[in-house]
């Protein structure tokens, strides 16, 4: 993953994840985050090319947008109107057996 860092409340950040080791276009992808306060929390999901359906956690709905580029084996998370409670380590993940986890990127939202 890339794109983490320090952002002020109300700011924006875009995370990127380039996946490897599997046929990216065949799998749903997720973003999850981990924080000391909330533990591991699912953030967003994007499904396959037939519509690229998306689903979001209530806490990020209307603020975060997940997208993907199958030609680049990449999944993205555009995050707007960031809040302190969005602070955490963000991972791209692929459900399945075995599952896939990116290395994670840290986002800190603080003034």
Swiss-Prot record:
<dbReference type="GO" id="GO:0003823">
    <property type="term" value="F:antigen binding"/>
</dbReference>
<protein>
    <recommendedName>
        <fullName>Ig heavy chain V-III region HPC76</fullName>
    </recommendedName>
</protein>
<dbReference type="InterPro" id="IPR013106">
    <property type="entry name" value="Ig_V-set"/>
</dbReference>
<dbReference type="GO" id="GO:0019814">
    <property type="term" value="C:immunoglobulin complex"/>
</dbReference>
<dbReference type="InterPro" id="IPR036179">
    <property type="entry name" value="Ig-like_dom_sf"/>
</dbReference>
<dbReference type="InterPro" id="IPR007110">
    <property type="entry name" value="Ig-like_dom"/>
</dbReference>
<dbReference type="GO" id="GO:0005576">
    <property type="term" value="C:extracellular region"/>
</dbReference>
<dbReference type="Pfam" id="PF07686">
    <property type="entry name" value="V-set"/>
</dbReference>
<dbReference type="InterPro" id="IPR013783">
    <property type="entry name" value="Ig-like_fold"/>
</dbReference>
<dbReference type="GO" id="GO:0016064">
    <property type="term" value="P:immunoglobulin mediated immune response"/>
</dbReference>
<dbReference type="InterPro" id="IPR050199">
    <property type="entry name" value="IgHV"/>
</dbReference>
<keyword id="KW-0391">Immunity</keyword>
<keyword id="KW-1280">Immunoglobulin</keyword>
<dbReference type="InterPro" id="IPR003599">
    <property type="entry name" value="Ig_sub"/>
</dbReference>
<keyword id="KW-1064">Adaptive immunity</keyword>
<feature type="domain" description="Ig-like">
    <location>
        <begin position="1"/>
        <end position="110"/>
    </location>
</feature>
